[in-house]
């Protein structure tokens, strides 16, 4: 289907990799790269909020774009990883379009530090997340009208989260009332 959409005016294939949407029955980055390269087109991977700084380039993405402020937890900035030719083309955009949004030296330094910390930090596994949340969830489940359980990341990443449900009738309050009360506590919970 992707190949059928390529025309003589096609300059590149853009692949958006996002954990915010479950990507089932989609081409992988490697499969999209094969299609792009079969048509002598570069594959641009928008991995703005993704965590792995090497996987998409290793999967044959020609240029991979990350947000410096999302998973990397740096300042408002971005990171471009890719083949030299394409990175050079990105660097040509130092004037003109987008100039007002270019990152200053402080942002570059902040991003550099964030990347260093990101690459050297110990990553918590899903099993470790479950272990850390276990007592909390058990305690929540002792409260009438509250049901708490572990849910795994729908996009397939090794991330465990707590899902907490409220039985409004048993508690006598709506979920929105409970949310508002949690925001008003000594430690605000959103």
Residue ranges and their predicted role:
Residues 141-190:
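Conserved C-terminal alpha-helix-loop-beta "cap" of PLP-dependent enzymes
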Residues 126-128:
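Active-site capping/gating regions of soluble enzymes
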Residues 130, 134-138:
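Anionic-ligand binding region
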């Amino acid at each position: 289907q992707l190949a059928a959409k390529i025309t003589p005016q096609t300059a590149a294939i853009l692949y958006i990799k996002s954990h915010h949407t479950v990507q089932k029955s989609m081409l992988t980055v490697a499969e999209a790269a094969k299609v792009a390269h079969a048509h002598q087109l570069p594959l641009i991977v928008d991995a703005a909020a993704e965590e792995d700084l090497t996987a998409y380039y290793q999967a044959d993405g020609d240029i991979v774009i990350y947000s410096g402020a999302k998973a990397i937890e740096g300042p408002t900035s971005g990171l471009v990883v890719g083949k030299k030719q394409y990175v050079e083309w990105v660097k040509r955009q130092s004037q003109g379009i987008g100039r007002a949004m270019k990152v200053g030296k402080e942002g570059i330094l902040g991003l550099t530090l964030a990347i260093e910390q990101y690459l050297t930090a110990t990553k918590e596994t899903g099993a470790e997340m479950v272990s850390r949340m276990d007592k909390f969830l058990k305690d929540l489940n002792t409260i009438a009208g509250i049901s708490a359980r572990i849910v795994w990341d729908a996009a397939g990443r090794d991330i465990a989260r707590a899902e907490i449900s409220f039985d409004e009738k048993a508690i006598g309050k709506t979920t929105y009332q409970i949310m508002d009360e949690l925001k008003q506590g000594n430690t605000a919970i959103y």
